[in-house]
């Protein structure tokens, strides 16, 4: 996996947006470590076009207690100049297929949120998840501060049919 290309996609989200509440972009080596750690248990998918990495999505542990074993958290990042090309949708469709094959029943997305869009955050991620069939299930108010602004966090979930 091209950790360098994926870190280059992620870093601008950290440095210029409130989409992630991480405040310092990880090094390429740290990013590589995160990929390896995730892949021990969960899928990490990469979207490429003509050999160029355009985005990635992965599942992660929702909670560490065994009772949560049928749930996972989703994450997705698409290169900023590649939005609107269907990359996010394709990644999520594949991710959901892999989740179901793993026997997962719930996918949860933790999303930065603001009532009023600003230079650092819009509702694009919420709208994307709604289009993908996720529904809002929790809202935490003013729980994160970045770039001198308070931001909310919402959780959205996708529930697969119970087996």
Summary of predicted features, one role per range:
Residues 1-6:
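A short beta-loop-alpha structural element at the N-terminal edge
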Residues 8-25, 38:
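Helix-loop element at the rim of GNAT/NAT acetyltransferase active sites that forms part
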Residues 23-81, 92-93, 98, 102, ...:
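Acetyl-CoA-dependent GNAT
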Residues 58-61, 110-112, 126, 130-149:
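Conserved catalytic-core motifs of GNAT/GCN5-like acyltransferases
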Residues 75-83, 111-116:
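A short, internal acetyl-CoA/4′-phosphopantetheine-binding micro-motif in the GNAT/acyltransferase core
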Residues 86:
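Glycine-rich phosphate-binding loop
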Residues 99-121:
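Conserved GNAT acetyl-CoA-binding A-motif
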Residues 122, 142-163:
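C-terminal "cap" of GNAT-fold acetyltransferases
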